[in-house]
Amino acid sequence: MQENNINDLVASASRVIAPLWPIFTFAAHHPWMGLEKQSFEQVANWLKEARNVDIYPSASMIHSAKAKGEIEESFLQMSLSRWLDSQSFHIPREKAERFCQAALKLEKLPSSLLSSPEVNKLAEEMNYINTASMQASVMQPISSLIESQNSENLSDVLNYHIIKWCKLYLDESGSNWTMPNREKGFYRAWQHLITFDPALSKNERKVLKNWPQDAEVALARALSELGISESNIQSYLEGHLLSLPGWAGMIRWRSQQSIQEQELLIEYLAVRISMELAIVKPYLPLKNQKVEKKVSIVPLIASWIYWGNISTREWLQMPAAEQSELLAFAYRFDENIRRKLWLEAWEQTHAEQLREKIASTQRATNDKKRVLAQLAFCIDVRSEPFRRHLEKLGPFETFGIAGFFGLPIATSELGSNNNHPSLPVILKPKHQIKELTNENELKSYEQRKRVGSSVRYTFKTMKQNVMTSMALPELSGPLLGLQMVTRSFVPRGVGGFIRKLRKTMLQKPDTTFSLNHVHDTKGEIPIGFTKEEKVNYVRQALKIVGLTEKFAPLVVMCGHSSQSTNNPYAAALECGACGGAAGGFNARVFATLCNLPEVREALFAEGIKIPKDTIFAAAEHKTTVDELEWIYVPELSETAQEAFDCIESIMPNVSQHANRERLTQLPNFKTKIKNASKEAHRFAEDWSEIRPEWGLARNASFIIGQRELTQDCDLEGRAFLHNYDWKQDESGDILANIIAGPGTVAQWINLQYYASTVAPHYYGSGNKTTQTVTAGLGVMQGNASDLLPGLPWQSVMQSDSETYHSPLRLLIVIQAPSQYIERLLNNDFTFREKVQNGWVRLASVDPKGHWKNW
């Protein structure tokens, strides 16, 4: 096999896994992003066959949703009728409907019926029935087909070894003992050590002795010796990637970060399949490496007896052709189809409830009060309740925009030598922005910073050193024990004290930004912006939300951040549009750009007239405690000062209302809360708290339109809200950019929550309380599990038996005439594919308020 061919096959196979970002820069991703050319239904069926993974909501989730009024029976009947209309069958429609109605109750077939001698005898007598068309062939890793003498599946043995080697190579925690020859790449480092691995038997090490030094050659040789034909190689590689999707996803992400590691996924598969050969060689050759999943007709007959109300006597009296038709129909109307129809009914119910809510609260666009301040928030669903309460309590107008404010920047905070790409992970930064201050202030700040850093560094060094780690528990035990007790039993007081101490010690001096373009910089990313770029980014963001006239005296750009303690998933609660970081930096940079005279003059020449007394400021919305923290307030005009004072005066009430609404949704908060803000701070500071906030759980829709469309709507913190005025977008470019950027981020977030809810054992990350942070990369259950790719149980579940997140595919609602939607679908093939294949849902609201499902 040629090397180019194996490279192409690995690239094609990689579609079955998604890149996995390190947990401390957590970026939402949906696990099927490489499979969107297939329909959601096709992927669901394939995963069920290949990995026995269900990606439709379970029967218990569906029954619970129906009991809560989240699913209307009429929509289920409509879905069933559509499905029956799409099928070709030769049994009476009434009989088929009766069978389907009974099966849709999602009851399990009684085990007594399945094991009944009478039913099994019927099945034996029907051996003439041809079930070949019902069978599915799945290419499984050979190791998964073999059990050792200890009754241990060899795929588990293989996974144990691969996890060990992945941890060694990928370790980012700064271990003192690193993997030898790591700089030569994963495969070469593994090859250097594998023949000394005591965990392998002598015969297994012998197989790998003198193994090829080149990863591509080794992979091709291993596949050849395993007897995998060229036509089955891609399917075989996919099976191996799906065996440990977390570690494979991390490998794939790393391969995309640098040229030096671009072949890392090939190296991973070379290591994995070479080790598989060594482990399974004593059992070769196998008679049949392709697993034929034979269809048992026992449950098909039992389903007609139980749901079709057919007796065994009636079955025996049927002609063979009729029996075949009934079996084929029962096979087609399988559990996946039944749950698919329920999911569609659930989604249609949600869409209808949202339509009614929007229609009942729409107000005339000319019914406007005097606006004292305008505040732009991230589209994040957690902004919706905060915006709603803010608008109710004061003369304010709010906007929704992606929380990076359209700035493709990498941020470098004061005193830091590193930068963070503060934009959606689907984009690459084009500018580096540094936080600056004068030299004396910088030295003083860095000295204070070094004190804390040196303590942490000393502790880490002692922990990782063989000798000092023995003494560390005795030395640090009393202090850490005291910290554990105080942070668990008096979290708010201790947390507040630590925050004040940190603020005093690490109080930043007044800072500016490197906004002006620096020529001939050594880094890959240029520092600052040219004048044209400054104007372009400001114009673009103002136009995208429709804020090009009627500016209020104070315009506040609000990034957002979360606040939690002892939480490995802290980055998952930060701003997704800022790559898993707080959005305050971007908000401050954007507000600063808007205040520059050169920017305002250029915008004025283009017809965007920002009044002289309009001032842009920046703040950060703390989502865990629903507070607004000011991070940039320049000198204010008289009217802007009035607006600022008004915001300050009502903010405690806004926080109380928003916190009360949010906290009552948490488990164990059914009683009345006396002081919601204090309770929220306790959750944020308690390091034993496994659920400081719900994050983006229950997200279900992405609404693109003017604020009037949803103003006064209680959207329950379930909607991403992005401002959009179609009247200012004749070309449709603004809408296309919203769909391609924020729309994609929202879809990824939505499907990550979906996957973590419906398949928590495979796409989630299990129970937070039993997780281990591993190699500075992510979490595992214990020390020998997959690198867990999704969200923890506590992010999507109310209890062990009740979900909190409703697993619905994202509904994108666009306020625009139908021709805008048609143009978008015609021009954007990727988005059209997502809609057609069921990865997102799409609806529109035209200028007359008419709702249309696409």
Swiss-Prot record:
Record key words, sorted: Cell membrane, Membrane, Metal-binding, Transport, Zinc
Molecular function (Gene Ontology), one example: zinc ion binding
Entry superkingdom: Bacteria
Cofactor(s), names only, from the UniProt record: Zn(2+)
InterPro entries: DabA
Residues that bind Zn(2+): C378, D380, H560, C575
First-listed, main subcellular location of the protein, grouped into a coarse class: membrane
Quaternary context: Forms a complex with DabB.
Family indicated by similarity: Belongs to the inorganic carbon transporter (TC 9.A.2) DabA family.
Name of the protein described by the UniProt record: Probable inorganic carbon transporter subunit DabA
Organism encoding this protein: Bacillus cereus (strain ATCC 14579 / DSM 31 / CCUG 7414 / JCM 2152 / NBRC 15305 / NCIMB 9373 / NCTC 2599 / NRRL B-3711)
Gene designation: dabA
